[in-house]
A protein has these predicted regions:
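Glycine/threonine-rich phosphate-binding loop and adjacent beta-strand/alpha-helix elements that clamp
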Residues: 1-177
Length: 177
């Protein structure tokens, strides 16, 4: 329906981290291929016309529905270059139940240049960093057998979801450097 985004985790090949805090190699690794996966939902801003400072903790608040008792959510905020490379700036991971959720992300600090964009990537796994959640509500997902693994479809409400960014334009003019 309008105003909702859906995406599905297929059990046999869960999404991985693609750099960032949880990935190997860690740090600023281009994750554009990870973002292009069918089990990764992305939201990309328009290009910035002026420099912007992003400094502090990032937080995702979202309304997510699913028929499963639990699911995992890996949220990554990336800086996207004019050439399309996506470098992680902040990320968070949580095991959640359907409904209104909050995913705190690590703090970051960078200046976004004109022509660059921000991208939020959401995936229902971050394997092998975290065990794949079977969707059964089990407290210890690694104890579930392969037969217990479910295909999980998530539905995000755009109207009830927000990404909180500590961002402001960079001052320019006489006396400003």
């Amino acid at each position: 329906c309008m105003g909702r985004e859906s995406w599905t985790r297929v059990t046999g090949l869960p999404a991985g981290p693609g750099g960032g805090t949880f990935g190997l190699p860690g740090g600023p690794v281009d994750r554009a291929q990870t973002d292009a996966r069918s089990d990764t939902l992305t939201f990309t801003t328009e290009a910035f016309a002026t420099p912007h400072l992003l400094a502090g903790a990032v937080r995702l608040e979202a309304e997510i529905a699913t028929s499963m008792l639990s699911y995992d959510l890996h949220a990554v905020l990336s800086r996207v270059t004019e050439k399309g490379a996506a470098y992680p700036l902040a990320e968070g991971y949580a095991t959640l139940e359907p409904g209104h959720v909050t995913v705190p992300m690590r703090a970051t600090c960078c200046t976004l240049q004109p022509g660059e964009r921000l991208r939020l990537s959401l995936s229902p796994a971050c394997f092998p960093c975290f065990p794949v959640n079977p969707g059964t509500g089990a407290q210890q997902p690694w104890e579930a057998s392969l037969a217990d693994q479910n295909i999980i479809t998530l539905r995000l409400s755009r109207a009830n979801s927000r990404l909180h960014l500590p961002m402001q334009p960079v001052a320019s003019g006489p006396g400003k450097e």
